[in-house]
Amino acid sequence: MVGMNDGGGGGVVRVPGLADETNPTGTGGRAVEVDYVRCFHRHEPGENQCSSAVSKHIKAPVHLVWSLVRRFDQPQKYKPFVSRCIVQGGVGVGSLREVNIKSGLPATTSFERLEHLDDNEHILSIRIVGGDHRLKNYSSIITAHPETIDGRPGTLVIESFVVDVPDGNTKDETCYFVEALIKCNLKSLADISERLAVQDYTESIHH
């Protein structure tokens, strides 16, 4: 995982030191991640906001990973904390969804709007517009980038966010909490994508 933490101040997410134990491409790969963040993950955190980004290298081709990520109407396909999702109307920029959270978390419902969806560049952006949780003015961007891992097609996924810091919490505490949720989501995304990739590879051999 890569944590790229910005305590506020505007502009793109700052990337201090990168440490990614799952990075198969070494230092050069980390430089690429920094470039992707600067190009695609532009946030303007206010004085009482924090912004950060998390990355994950997945041993599955980008089209497969993206087929899960792009489903604004079905985040439960890979997000383990989502029990169900209801979309009002069709799926497109401006669409709203009601996301129900599984019991055990300090929230039950989140209302979210689709801000941007680009199937060519593999970019998805959402904004939380309501719900019984503490993630106020939360906005996120997730991108998927093709790469090669162990000689096979792989995907680098980066998810960044900006959010208000709740009363009684520090910027570091808020970023740590959100990063932990994103890491769980990306681990689940990797597990599911890699399992599907193995199935596809096995089927191609038998055919």
Predicted regions and their residues:
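Amphipathic alpha-helical interface elements that mediate macromolecular binding in regulatory proteins
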Residues: 63, 67, 73, 112, ...
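Amphipathic alpha-helical protein-protein interaction segments
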Residues: 47, 51, 58, 103, ...
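Short, highly charged C-terminal tails/helix-capping segments
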Residues: 39, 187-207
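Well-ordered beta-strand positions in beta-sheet-rich domains
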Residues: 53-57, 108-111, 139-143, 158-160
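Hydrophobic ligand-binding cavity/cleft-lining segments
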Residues: 2-92
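Short amphipathic alpha-helical segments embedded in low-complexity Lys/Glu-rich regions
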Residues: 82-86, 174-175, 205-206
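Beta-strand/loop substructures that line and gate deep hydrophobic ligand-binding cavities in soluble
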Residues: 3, 125-184
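Glycine-rich portal/gate segments that line the openings of hydrophobic small-molecule binding cavities
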Residues: 57, 63, 70-136, 196
